[in-house]
Amino acid sequence: ALGVVSPEDKEIKSVEELKGKTLIIAKGTTAETYFEKNHPEVKLQKYDAYADAYNALLDGRGDAFSTDNTEVIAWAKTNPGYVVGIETLGDYDTIAAAVAKGNTELLDFLNEEIRELGKENFFHKDYEETLKPVFGDDTDPDSIVVEGGEAGKN
C-alpha cells in the first residue's frame, strides 16, 4: 500500500485534503500510477530519483510526498517534523519471492513454508525484533507484515 508523509504542522490525513495542494512523487512508481488513475484532481510534482523527491519535500516545493507506506513511515521516523497522515492507501502490494512459471515443486515448497511460518506468527515476531525499532510503537504491524501469505491477517 501507499503512504503519504507531510510536515507535522500541515499534516495531510486524507486524499481529499490534497485538493489544491502539490503531491510529490517519484516517476514510474505505483504512487504515480495510483494518483493519475484514481485522483487526477491532485497536482503531481514528479522527480526521477527518490532523493530528489524527498529533498523537494524538505525544501517545501510540495505539500506532501507519496510512495510505499513502509518507506514513508521509516523516513518520517528519522526526519523530525514530518508525519505519515495517510498510512495505508490503494492496493496492498507485497514484496515477495518469485518463482519461475512451471516450477511447481519450488512454488509448492515455498507456499507450504510460508503457511507453516504463519502458524508460528513468525513474520510478526520478526517485525517486533527488526522493524519495530525503526517504525516505532504507533505503526500498525498489519499495515506492513503479511502473515502466512495472507495480507491483513495475523
List where the protein language model places each region.
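Flexible hinge/capping segments at coil-to-helix
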Residues: 6-23
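Structural recognition of the beta-strand scaffold that forms the well-ordered cores
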Residues: 3-5, 22-26, 44-46, 64-67, ...
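Ligand-binding clefts/hinges and TM-proximal coupling segments of bilobed small-molecule sensing domains
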Residues: 30-47, 84-86, 114-154
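A ligand-binding cleft/hinge motif common to bilobed small-molecule-binding domains
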Residues: 37, 51, 58-91
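Stable alpha-helical elements in mature extracytoplasmic
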Residues: 14, 31, 49-53, 68-72, ...
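Short helix-initiation/N-cap motifs at beta->coil->alpha
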Residues: 10, 27-30, 45-59
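Periplasmic-binding protein-like
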Residues: 1-6, 73-114, 134-153
